[in-house]
């Protein structure tokens, strides 16, 4: 029995590869649609389209985000500590924009191959669109689910390392209503 009023939920997603449209099987929009949203009666779905002009997408998505503040963000943490596509080299806790174009760190791209999203590194896009850290942190509630031993070091750094852009997920410790759910493998270093 569902306890969520799905018909009142307006869904957004956090990041997308530049060059992929929402119907591409490697896109996050496709994954979210197939695994969750298509199974529920959602009020509206707002996907990032990585195949359109980047500046237009940023402008349009920013308008949506500013008109409809985020209530809850469901997220994971990458092997390098990224949240959304805010990898350590491009993460900025004080970004002044809601969304930006980023170059993906190789470790992040390798994770996409290891996760089975792409058959080889040369097929993983090098750039993406991402909601910025201040945008994610603006949500009233953050739910973070992180399984697997490959994420264990990132979990340790998130919980016990310095709060810095070297581990973008470390900023979650400053959110007043962030919840972290991990499995035994992800907890192996804590």
Which ranges hold each PLM region?
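Short beta-strand segments
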Residues: 13, 48, 74-77, 144-147, ...
